[in-house]
Amino acid sequence: MDKPRVRFAPSPTGYLHIGGARTALFNWLWARRNGGTFVLRIEDTDRERSTQLAVDAILDGLRWLGLDWDEGPGVGGPHPPYFQTERLDLYKAHAERLIREGKAYACYCTREELDAQRKQAEAEKRQFRYPGTCRDEPYDPSRPHVVRFRVPDAGATSWNDLVKGVISTPHDTLQDEVILRGDGVPLYNFGAVVDDITMEINLVGRGDDHVNNTARQILMYEALGYPVPTFAHFPMILGADKARLSKRHGATSVTAYRDLGFLPQAVVNYLVRLGWSHGDQELFTLDELVRYFDLKDVGATAGVFNLEKMAWVNHEWLKRLSPEELAKLALPHFRAAGLPAEDDEKLRHVCAVARERAKTLGEYVQQFRYFYAPIALDPKAKAKFLTADTRPVLQAVRDAIAALPALETQAVEQVFHGEAERRGVGLGKVAQPARVALTGGTASPGMYDVVQILGKDETLRRLDEAIRVAGQPG
């Protein structure tokens, strides 16, 4: 069996989204497992919607996920160029060859004529199919025209899909579709076939929304006289309501998840499990995925995207990292929020306590910004815990911390336990007022962690401010 040559061919009309990223991942894994080649091709023929910004975002997203390409933009390869708009001569040459051989023909029908036929079909409540008006017209390249592919009148086209099994499409359900517009730009099916032929792609892995294109493309391969590649159509990714995945389900671009603080290995890990499994194992490194992944194990049932589950996977990966590793990853997120964090012992301590509590690096910032910014007292917490009755408690805690020669864990813990014992109350009666004073709210890591991270000077300053406002309205 030849080594696989697979491709990912996104359209740069938007960012790299979840479905596209999984398609790229499955192809990349198959190529890497089998010593094959992963080709990146940019299908930019929609000139009105394609942008360089989107191209850059797609490349950036793939790099962030760790999906390097062997041929394509930025790395070259033996079958350039890798942008469709730079390959128009190829499409024209293949279309003209099909015309010469009677397998395609020039269609001179005007848009107005076709629109009238569509309206008539609609009025008669039947599906419009091009009636082959120009099938036998002589070719006159001087007349404005498009090129249509001549679909065989009888029979069916079948293929054995690696994921979905045997699929057959009767030819009488197809029409003579346009393959080349008047401006020389190919339509999707023809452009993909010519590119896959000239780039020697032997396995086409893509979403199963392309199943209906496959018979048309196989007919084009056969008409051009080239081997038909193997096809694998991956199941769709749906939202929780079983509708097609969209932003309202929490799905967004891959780079947006990066900016929210997801790790690339977590996103890869979650995406691969949307349609593929290996026993009961949940977490995989990229190396493990390359070792285990097999297209035969991709299911035909649609996967359901669950942002909470992806956050859980991300949390599991975060917990595998050391505070030192987490600090380097979290630092850009703190700085992006305008917080004066540094890659130092303070941030490493913050990450150590955040690791069990927060599921994304973005949540590190949301939950623990009070270590780097002035606190905003929660009104309900202030009213309940910063009162005239708790002012003496706060003062006692403040004085005890001020007297400590160093903020050793045991010594800081003893400040709170000792004050609770002295007053004959539970620890919460001492710790909660101090927690509100130091963090602004009622949920935080242990008080010894909070005090150590803030440092003595900032701890005393915040306690002094809490003592000042305790019992005051507002």
Curated annotation (Swiss-Prot):
GO terms for biological process: glutamyl-tRNA aminoacylation. Keywords: Aminoacyl-tRNA synthetase, ATP-binding, Cytoplasm, Ligase, Metal-binding, Nucleotide-binding, Protein biosynthesis, Zinc. InterPro entries: aa-tRNA-synth_I_cd-bd (IPR045462), aa-tRNA-synth_I_codon-bd_sub2 (IPR020751), aa-tRNA-synth_I_CS (IPR001412), aa_tRNA-synth_I_cd-bd_sf (IPR008925), Glu-tRNA-ligase_bac/mito (IPR004527), Glu-tRNA-synth_I_codon-bd_sub1 (IPR020752), Glu/Gln-tRNA-synth (IPR000924), Glu/Gln-tRNA-synth_Ib_cat-dom (IPR020058). Belongs to the class-I aminoacyl-tRNA synthetase family. Glutamate--tRNA ligase type 1 subfamily. It is found in: Cytoplasm. It comes from Anaeromyxobacter dehalogenans (strain 2CP-C). Its EC number is 6.1.1.17. GO terms for cellular component: cytosol. The keyword Oxidoreductase does not apply. This is Glutamate--tRNA ligase. Catalyzes the attachment of glutamate to tRNA(Glu) in a two-step reaction: glutamate is first activated by ATP to form Glu-AMP and then transferred to the acceptor end of tRNA(Glu). Its cofactor is Zn(2+). Zn(2+) binds at residues 107, 109, 134, 136. A motif ('KMSKS' region) lies at residues 244-248. One of its GO terms (molecular function) is zinc ion binding. Pfam families: Anticodon_2 (PF19269), tRNA-synt_1c (PF00749). Monomer. ATP binds at residue 247. It is an enzyme of class 6 (ligase). Binds 1 zinc ion per subunit. It catalyses: tRNA(Glu) + L-glutamate + ATP = L-glutamyl-tRNA(Glu) + AMP + diphosphate. A motif ('HIGH' region) lies at residues 10-20. The keyword S-adenosyl-L-methionine does not apply.
